């Protein structure tokens, strides 16, 4: 298996998506290079963040997704969950391959994990808002 190592930034993830299409490598795993524990038999490719490539992917996502779904992808990225980042990578790849209704396919394990991560992030956001409200009222 091929592993794409990126710096952990959102633009780094989007650059990895661009690179996967450029190199025609679709069955890849992405990981942050600081936390990656490699295997002797796996190939690793270090992805250097390129804002131009990332912006091209962002522009394509804006055209393919509703603004709400576009924001949800970034929200799931903020979870800092490695498996969720792989799910986001997979979702973006499928969107650019032409599967426009990919986010509604709950039969796919990657999509299901993505939605579960979104739910976790939104729950944490709600708790933080409640905590801040509680602090302000005192």
Region roles according to the model:
Residues 97-138:
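Internal, well-folded beta-alpha domain core
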Residues 11-15, 45-46, 69-76, 111-117:
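Short, mixed-charge, low-aromatic patches
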Residues 1-51:
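N-terminal ordered "arm"
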Residues 54-104:
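A basic- and aromatic-enriched beta-loop-alpha substructure that forms the phosphate/nucleotide-
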Residues 16-22, 52, 75-81, 115-123:
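Phosphate-binding glycine-rich loops and adjacent basic patches that engage nucleotide phosphates
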């Amino acid at each position: 298996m091929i592993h794409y190592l990126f710096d952990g930034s959102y633009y780094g993830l989007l650059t990895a998506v661009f690179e996967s299409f450029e190199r025609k490598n679709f069955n890849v795993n992405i990981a942050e290079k600081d936390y990656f524990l490699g295997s002797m038999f796996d190939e690793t490719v270090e992805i250097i963040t390129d804002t131009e490539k990332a912006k091209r992917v962002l522009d394509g996502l804006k055209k393919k997704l509703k603004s709400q779904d576009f924001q949800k992808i970034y929200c799931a990225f903020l979870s800092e969950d490695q498996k969720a980042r792989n799910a986001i990578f997979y979702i973006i790849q499928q969107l650019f391959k032409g599967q426009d209704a990919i986010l509604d396919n709950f039969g796919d394990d990657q999509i299901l994990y993505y939605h579960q991560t979104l739910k976790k992030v939104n729950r944490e956001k709600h708790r933080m808002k409640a905590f801040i409200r509680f602090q302000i009222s005192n």
